[in-house]
Regions:
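Vicinal oxygen chelate
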Residues: 1-5, 27-80, 89-116, 124-131
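Conserved beta-strand-loop-alpha-helix junction that forms the acyl-donor binding cleft
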Residues: 10-13
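Conserved active-site tyrosine of GNAT-family acetyltransferases
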Residues: 16-21, 92, 118
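Conserved catalytic-loop position in the HRD/HxD motif
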Residues: 84
């Protein structure tokens, strides 16, 4: 068994697609519309056939409340791993509002950014490779 898809709720699909592709650097994997519904996913350019991030409209009141609560509490809705958080911060900082610049914490260095769609995302560089 493996993880193939994870959801992140967003308030605007086009804005989310722009952020996750043009700012974060992912690639659009799937973009299909049918009857007012749009299935939109992005993936890592390093693993385009790997795990996909489903950008899902927060039309459901429970989803919207959950998203807002996480944001207000400063909790990231998604965490992405990198081998160089400072490099990714420098690449993204002019186009993204970082709530936390690269910061050393126990076992890793992290940075947190506003995805412009109602979420905080966290970029994480582990101190060592876990096996």
């Amino acid at each position: 068994m493996k993880i193939k898809l994870a959801n992140i709720y967003v308030d605007d699909l086009d804005k989310a697609l722009h952020f996750y592709t043009q700012v974060a650097g992912f690639v659009k994997k799937t973009d299909v519309s049918q009857g007012g519904y749009r299935w939109l996913t992005v993936a890592s350019p390093e693993e385009p056939d790997g795990t996909e991030l489903h950008l899902e409209r927060n039309d459901n009141p429970a989803a919207k409340a959950y998203q807002q609560a996480l944001f207000e509490q400063g909790q990231p809705a998604a965490m992405f791993y990198t081998d160089d958080v400072k490099r990714d911060y420098e690449r993204m900082k002019d186009a993204a509002e970082f709530k936390m610049p690269p910061t050393k914490v126990t076992g890793s260095t992290i940075a947190q950014a506003n995805d412009t769609c109602g979420n905080l995302i966290q970029i994480t560089q582990l101190d060592r490779v876990r096996t």
